[in-house]
């Protein structure tokens, strides 16, 4: 569905997601969830592991990072995460891909400047 919607988009379409995340949504990239990559804070505290799963809150960022079993979350690691493609876990993975290597950055530049060139 995303591939059909986003595959031949007009130049004027503005999205607030990274180009590699949009490619992930279109099925052109594979990523693992990075559940700690987009932490949520609200009046109840720091929500773990992400705002989609209701697994409680902690009062400090340190508690969130050190006391959450991050390896227990993500597609294939937790049944609640099955079929998830939401930005709160996968956008961080796409950003890591972008800035983790020169080739990732080059892919992002190409997609940004030439979105319909494949």
Model-derived segments and spans:
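Long, charge-rich boundary regions
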Residues: 114-118
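Accessory C-terminal segments flanking Radical SAM cores
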Residues: 2-109
